[in-house]
Amino acid sequence: MLAPARKHVLVRMPGELKRLLAEEVRRTGDSLNDVAVGILASRFAVPFDPSGRPGKEPGKSGSVLLRMPPELKDKLAARAVQRRRNVNDLIVETLTERLGKEPMATTNGKVRRSDDKVRVAIIGVGNCASSLVQGVEYYKDADPEEFVPGLMHVDLGGYHVRDIEFTAAFDVTTDKVGKDLSEAIWEHPNNTIKFSDVPKTGVTVHRGMTHDGLGKYLSEVVEKAPGETDDVVGILKETNTDVVINYLPVGSEEATKWYTEQILRAGCAMVNCMPVFIARENYWQRRFEEAGVPIIGDDIKSQVGATITHRVLASIFRDRGVRLDRTFQLNFGGNSDFMNMLERDRLESKKISKTNSVKSVLPYELPDTDIHVGPSDYVPWLEDRKWAYIRLEGTSFGDVPLNAELKIEVWDSPNSAGVVIDAVRLTKLALNNGVSGALAGPSSYLMKSPPVQHNDDEARDLTEEFIRKHPRKQVKESAKA
């Protein structure tokens, strides 16, 4: 099958940008079109096969004709409308941002970042952090040829689970700050299941920023560590951290935005596991693009949790021609997140995230009065277990009612740890290959509220394609004249 014909876009370029493009052509030996379109395709996550033609100096004309995939042209047009500017200006800005400063991928690999490890920092040493740290230890010797529950691949794009190395951690409670990460993960109020011993990591938990990270009820059972907030940016730089995971409590809106600023200043990638919307927001997408670093977000999915199960059931109704009339999902748990969510104003973004994730699989709009998805109550004896009750009421052939109910019981934090292990390795692949901004495919597969919602099968295919196109080691063949 022939590839779709490329579309032509005539771009008016300032002299300084043409000079930068000429320098890149000389440096890489690639054609001007391959350089420029390659940058645009990388920025907007569109597949692009370079021509391999040798580079030529750009001509004296003030305009350059770019030949690009139709999908890229469509994405540029859509983003231009979104940002209220024309396509020409968007192309010039994107190329200038990338060529006007040293790309992060170059500094990642050559100056301060290690290509052989995925260096990870954690914000919030709670149950999820505990399960993640245990999981990396538990699967460090896993056979890449064997199936491991909860992981896309033991070896993902050239990175094994054991290639994940923890470099820094931040928390605000006296029980955790100042302790080795391997000890802090067992401290109060953490109460998730233990499935692996963890040796000393050599990573001391630093005093982080509180802001709105501790809610009213959680503040009654933990004590804030004394002292000033440690130098987050300096620590991330000194430890050569690649990726920062946001594990702050639900409702930490201001704290998440503050940490996001520190992550950008440090030049790190981000995996936003919380339902504070960063990756899906245009403003933050642009900030990560400008910084030259990737982000996966927002709000981590579980391996098999209440929301993914709810999505599948709603999809079955859709695919089998049953009209979904109303539905609910009620969640109960005994961890600190459920305690935090006793404050109803802290769970607004969580409720929006879970609701949108379910509604996105339907081809029609379900009124807000007919869908309720969200945390319901805190039950201390459940500890880190979560119970979810799901009900769907629909109309089938002959306008006959069809109803379905399901109960699911999980250990909440281990249920998402494998997903995060995949997420940090995917962001590392993006860093290595100079891909910046929100990673659309991986975010859709791994997160409840991504920038773009795809159905689960399509999202996985996009993520697998991302891995194939951005492996750890790439050998570039010499272009033939």
Describe the role of every protein-language-model region.
Residues 418-481:
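NAD(P)-dependent Rossmann-like dehydrogenase/reductase catalytic/cofactor-binding core
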Residues 30-52, 85-107:
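Short, basic amphipathic alpha-helical segments that act as recognition/interaction helices
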Residues 106-259, 347-352, 388, 397:
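N-terminal glycine-/serine-/threonine-rich beta1-alpha1-beta2 phosphate-ribose binding loop
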Residues 123, 162-165, 176, 187-190, ...:
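Active-site-lining helix/loop region of Rossmann-like oxidoreductase modules
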Residues 1-13, 46-68, 77:
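Short Lys/Arg-rich basic patches
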Residues 14-34, 70-89, 93:
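Surface-exposed, Lys/Arg-rich phosphate-binding patches that contact polyanionic backbones
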Residues 287-300, 321, 325:
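Rossmann-fold dehydrogenase core element
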Residues 250-262, 273-294:
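Rossmann-fold NAD(P)-binding glycine/threonine-rich loop
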